[in-house]
């Protein structure tokens, strides 16, 4: 049971890592959408006639900041991906350990049942032998 609870704990930690990856993926998608929206707004701002350079420069700076944020999120997702793999390996190892212990427990149970059956047969043989001897006397 201790090994099963350790395995369950490892599964929970793996699920946490998956949730962290999902959150990072969502944030990365939101940043990508914001980058696209900023580009579209920048294109619309550049129309024939008047050009607002301050607005264009500000939009470019904002887009650069968003790209940096997206890169950071990508690095974080890569790190979380490595952690997911480590936790997945830990879960697999815990599963193997639990299965091995279950097999061992089953073998011990079978061995015990076989020993009990042999004992019962021996007792029955002794009773039959005594009965036969008493009948011969």
Predicted features along the sequence, with ranges:
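Charge-rich amphipathic alpha-helical interaction elements
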Residues: 1-137
């Amino acid at each position: 049971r201790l090994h099963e609870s350790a395995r369950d704990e490892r599964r929970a930690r793996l699920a946490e890592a998956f949730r962290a990856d999902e959150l990072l993926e969502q944030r990365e998608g939101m940043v990508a959408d914001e980058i696209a929206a900023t580009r579209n707004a920048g294109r619309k701002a550049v129309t024939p006639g008047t050009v607002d350079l301050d607005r264009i420069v500000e939009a470019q700076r904002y887009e650069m900041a968003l790209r940096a944020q997206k890169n950071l999120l990508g690095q974080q997702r890569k790190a979380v991906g490595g952690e997911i793999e480590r936790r997945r390996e830990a879960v697999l190892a815990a599963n193997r350990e639990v299965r091995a212990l279950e097999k061992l427990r089953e073998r011990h149970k079978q061995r015990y049942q076989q020993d009990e059956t042999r004992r019962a047969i021996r007792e029955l043989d002794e009773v039959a032998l005594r009965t036969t001897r008493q009948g011969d006397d």
